[in-house]
């Protein structure tokens, strides 16, 4: 436990030092910053804010977790595969950000390219991680999927990777939401005695807390796709490594809600010839524009943050209660 906590502290400090250096480099190199949604007027002041800051906490957490695990004899298959997903999905996000920022390709990777790379990473993860007989845990009950587990694994990794990416649209929202989710999985890992996975979790929590100091409103830096895609993939990988896949539907309710809002909006728009359910999606923008109803007073980014963090915290506590108190 001491090793895991130490890893978190070291990653926190490295990120705390690394982010200002990253911002300074970004400014000196005169790199074009984040582009903003035109429909959310309060976001226009953020135009030009440095992005790709997730690169800092990602590198710090991966290196710290790897070396701490190596020197404490905890470099297990599970640790290796979680770090692999972090690195690969981080690289996919980096390429996406690179095309947007440096090549001025607004779309970045097109959806087919991004999906292909995410699926490739998922296949490699499936082939090497300890699956325990391709058993899917559904509310604590084992479901033997056999070879078909690979389709679930791909859906889980790609789905939650993109879901966290959608959540990263308000200052600090994604970073602390993931901290809350990881904290819940940290408890599960500790109870299961999987201290190797706990080490990786605490290393990332440390990095995200260090990043949040510069990412809360008004944000001095954004994590970019390099951070959000990696974090979503990490959450999916951890839920599978702990054989508690179903828990991510509740622990990750914020990401599920954000993704579902987009799917509902697009489907309803097509079916009705242009009508909308929400003022704007992902749904955090709906709250920004007009509160819960979409027709009331606009919510500040802090209010949106605390609402979603509260939902995420309650969902995480509910999951732990279901697992250990019922």
UniProtKB/Swiss-Prot annotation:
Cofactor: Mg(2+)
Main localization (coarse): membrane
Transmembrane regions: 3-23, 51-71, 79-99, 115-135, 138-158, 169-189, 195-215, 221-243, 306-326
Pathway as given in its UniProt record: Cell wall biogenesis; peptidoglycan biosynthesis
Keywords of this entry: Cell cycle, Cell division, Cell membrane, Cell shape, Cell wall biogenesis/degradation, Magnesium, Membrane, Metal-binding, Peptidoglycan synthesis, Transferase, Transmembrane, Transmembrane helix
Coiled coil stretches, renumbered: none
Superkingdom to which the source organism belongs: Bacteria
Cross-referenced CDD domains: GT_MraY
Entry's Gene Ontology BP terms: cell division; cell wall organization; peptidoglycan biosynthetic process; regulation of cell shape
Family stated for the protein in its record: Belongs to the glycosyltransferase 4 family. MraY subfamily.
Protein name: Phospho-N-acetylmuramoyl-pentapeptide-transferase
Species whose genome carries this gene: Streptococcus pneumoniae serotype 19F (strain G54)
Protein encoded by which gene: mraY
């Amino acid at each position: 436990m001491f090793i895991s906590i130490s890893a978190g502290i070291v990653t926190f400090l490295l990120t705390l030092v690394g982010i200002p250096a990253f911002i300074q480099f970004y400014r000196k190199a005169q790199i074009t910053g984040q582009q903003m949604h035109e429909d959310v007027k309060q976001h226009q002041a953020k135009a030009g804010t440095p992005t790709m800051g997730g690169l800092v906490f990602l590198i710090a957490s991966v290196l710290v977790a790897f070396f701490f695990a190596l020197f404490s004899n905890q470099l297990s298959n599970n640790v290796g595969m979680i770090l692999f997903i972090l690195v690969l999905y981080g690289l996919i996000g980096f390429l996406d950000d690179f095309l947007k920022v440096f090549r001025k390709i607004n779309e970045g990777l097109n959806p087919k390219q991004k999906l292909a790379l995410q699926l490739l990473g998922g296949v490699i993860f499936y082939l090497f991680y300890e699956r325990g007989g391709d058993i899917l845990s559904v509310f604590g009950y084992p479901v033997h999927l056999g070879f078909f587990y690979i389709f679930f694994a791909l859906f889980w990794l790609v789905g939650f990777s993109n879901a966290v990416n959608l959540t990263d649209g308000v200052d600090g929202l994604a970073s602390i939401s993931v901290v809350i989710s990881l904290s819940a999985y940290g408890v599960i890992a500790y109870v299961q005695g999987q201290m190797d996975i706990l080490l990786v979790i605490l290393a990332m929590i440390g990095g995200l807390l260090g990043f949040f100091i510069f990412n809360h409103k008004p944000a001095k830096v954004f994590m970019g796709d390099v951070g959000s895609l990696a974090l979503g993939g990490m959450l999916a990988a951890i839920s599978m490594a702990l054989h508690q896949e179903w828990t991510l539907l509740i622990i990750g309710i914020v990401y599920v809600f954000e993704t579902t809002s987009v799917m509902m909006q697009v489907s309803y728009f097509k079916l009705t010839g242009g009508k909308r359910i929400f003022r704007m999606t992902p749904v955090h923008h709906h709250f920004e524009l007009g509160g819960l109803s979409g027709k009331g007073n606009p919510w500040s980014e802090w209010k949106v943050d605390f609402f979603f963090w509260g939902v995420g915290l309650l969902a995480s506590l509910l999951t732990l209660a279901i697992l250990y108190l019922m």
